C-alpha cells in the first residue's frame, strides 16, 4: 500500500506542539483592519490551540507530523 500524502494546505497553516496539540493562527487579520477595534487586533495576534474536534480533522490531513 502506498504512503499517504500530507495535505500541502494543512502543513502551511498548522503545526504541532510537543504534547501533540495543534496550533493555528486565528482568522480575520488579512484585510479590513482599519474598521476593527484595537482589542480585536490584539486578540487575533499570535497562535491558538485548536479544539479536540478540529485537531482530529487536521491530524488526518497530516499523517506523519505528530
Swiss-Prot record:
The keyword Hydrolase does not apply. One of its GO terms (cellular component) is cytosolic large ribosomal subunit. InterPro entries: Ribosomal_bL35, Ribosomal_bL35-like, Ribosomal_bL35_CS, Ribosomal_bL35_sf. Keywords: Ribonucleoprotein, Ribosomal protein. GO terms for biological process: translation. GO terms for molecular function: structural constituent of ribosome. The keyword Ribosomal protein applies. Disulfide bonds: none annotated. Belongs to the bacterial ribosomal protein bL35 family. HAMAP family: Ribosomal_bL35. NCBIfam families: rpmI_bact (TIGR00001). This is Large ribosomal subunit protein bL35. The lineage of its organism: Bacteria, Pseudomonadati, Pseudomonadota, Alphaproteobacteria, Rhodobacterales.
Amino acid at each position: 500500500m502506498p504512503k499517504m500524502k500530507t495535505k500541502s494546505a494543512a502543513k502551511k497553516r498548522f503545526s504541532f506542539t510537543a504534547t501533540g496539540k495543534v496550533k493555528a493562527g486565528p482568522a480575520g487579520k488579512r484585510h479590513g483592519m482599519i474598521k476593527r477595534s484595537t482589542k480585536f487586533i490584539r486578540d487575533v495576534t499570535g497562535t491558538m490551540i485548536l479544539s479536540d474536534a478540529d485537531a482530529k480533522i487536521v491530524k488526518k490531513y497530516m499523517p506523519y507530523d505528530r
